[in-house]
Amino acid sequence: MRLLGLDVGSKTIGVAVSDPLGITAQAVMTIPIDEDRHNFGMRSLKKLVREYEANGFVLGLPKNMDGTAGRSVSRSKAMGERLEQKFGLPVYYDDERLTTVASERILVEEAGMHDRRQRKEVVDQMAAVLILQNYLDLQRKE
């Protein structure tokens, strides 16, 4: 089962894809969005669903550190509903607490990306990888 992992933000969506066996996640791209113009990246996502023959989506659920729903939870849930309606594929959610912080740390410490502008281009993709990989790991444990 091949899944697309999404890190949904206010201006971009980071995208990752699982391998066909559902073991590893790899970064794919960052899709610009414009909520004010109702551009939610569906055209790009449609191409990715076809290209990777995706069977579903995993979206990050931005909870607060105490486990309560963060302000952006409604954005992720609304995107999940749009995806279900548009593609008819299942949408799963995974706790995304600290994925952006972890992504920044990985990019600086392991990839040597000290330029903030350079990191900005890939941090959403890395967050999507962490969201999807966490989901895949949890599924294998069950």
Curated annotation (Swiss-Prot):
Which GO molecular function annotation, any one, does this entry have?
Answer: nuclease activity
Tell me which UniProt keywords the record has, alphabetically.
Answer: Cytoplasm, Hydrolase, Nuclease, Ribosome biogenesis
Family (UniProt) = Belongs to the YqgF nuclease family.
Q: What is its EC number?
A: 3.1.-.-
The compartments listed are:
Cytoplasm
CDD domains from the UniProt entry? YqgF
Signal peptide location: none
What is the protein's major site of localization? cytoplasm
Listed name of the protein: Putative pre-16S rRNA nuclease
